[in-house]
């Protein structure tokens, strides 16, 4: 698992992926996104070389681009992942602790969160917090929907759930 973070600039994805390609790496699941003024990459890759050789090849590129990286050997293989069966959207007035409260309630209702994205919109005097979650409803949709209804009522947010059917092919 390769994790990189640094100030956003053009060419990060191209240069990092080029290093991995040159090492005969096969990329699997990846998340690459800009957060604030930073860019972050988390990706799985199968690379035939030893971990220290990968670090040696990545370091000059990371130094040049101002990136920090962390590399871990993991057991999971490429293309061995769980697909989400539900998408949840929560939005309302920005309030401290909403992510902790929402994810606690959803976890207790059996949701295994696979992806969570959030943003703050609106205006400085009335910010709106928006959260989108994809996951697996381990205890079923009804249990999850009940938890969302309680959350919406208690925290005065809009909480919506949509079952999804994802196909990877």
Place the predicted regions along the sequence by residue.
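A conserved regulatory-domain signal marking ACT and ACT-like small-molecule sensing domains
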Residues: 1-169
